[in-house]
Amino acid sequence: GKRKNVKRLCKRWCDQVMQIEQFFPTNISNSFCPFHNEVEKQLIDHCFSISKTIKKSDNIFQNNGQLYTTYGTHDILLDEKFERLNNWIKDEVKKYVDTLRMKVNLKYEGNAFFNIYKKHDYQETHDHAGSIISCIYFLKSNEKSSRVFFKSRMYDNIEHDSSNPPTGNVWFESQPGKLLIFRS
């Protein structure tokens, strides 16, 4: 008697359990450049050299106003010193697109730039309008460097527990040689 009632209650409860499925994920690739140590110093020196000769961009993307950026002033896709790294990044983007079975014609149009962050420099959350895929490559950083945060593109006015990855912000440590690839 009691055992049958418990089974019946359990079955009824199990039949009514809510199933939550996750759709429209944000796919973020996270990989490390296998030759980062070979190019790191040369590219860091090159970036600092550029920062001394090319004025920082006046573009007003949101930051504290101190951030040095070559956005719109120096396209590193056209800079020969970045060629090896750019080619590796293009290969990684192709893998990302192929893995996600995206039907997109990769022309690698657009631009690439670098930012030099000092203590207290930051950027606000932003989108890359007009782009399909974006990348972030960390040339230099340390354990005190800021993390990169991603938040859902879906407007949500309900605060969630940040320990619940599908609903909270997601972040990545900035580590030398790390490449993040994501939908713009």
What name fits each language-model region?
Residues 3, 13, 61-62, 113, ...:
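Intrinsically disordered, low-complexity peptide-like regions
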Residues 87-91, 95, 99-119, 125:
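Extracellular-facing segments of soluble proteins and assemblies that are Gly/Ser/Thr-biased and enriched
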Residues 110-181:
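Catalytic core of non-heme Fe(II) oxygenases with the double-stranded beta-helix
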Residues 22-25, 106-108, 176:
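A short, polar/charged loop/turn motif at coil->beta-strand junctions and beta-hairpin connectors
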Residues 13, 17-102:
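Non-heme Fe(II)/2-oxoglutarate
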Residues 1-17:
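N-terminal amphipathic/basic-hydrophobic helices that include classical n-h-c signal peptides
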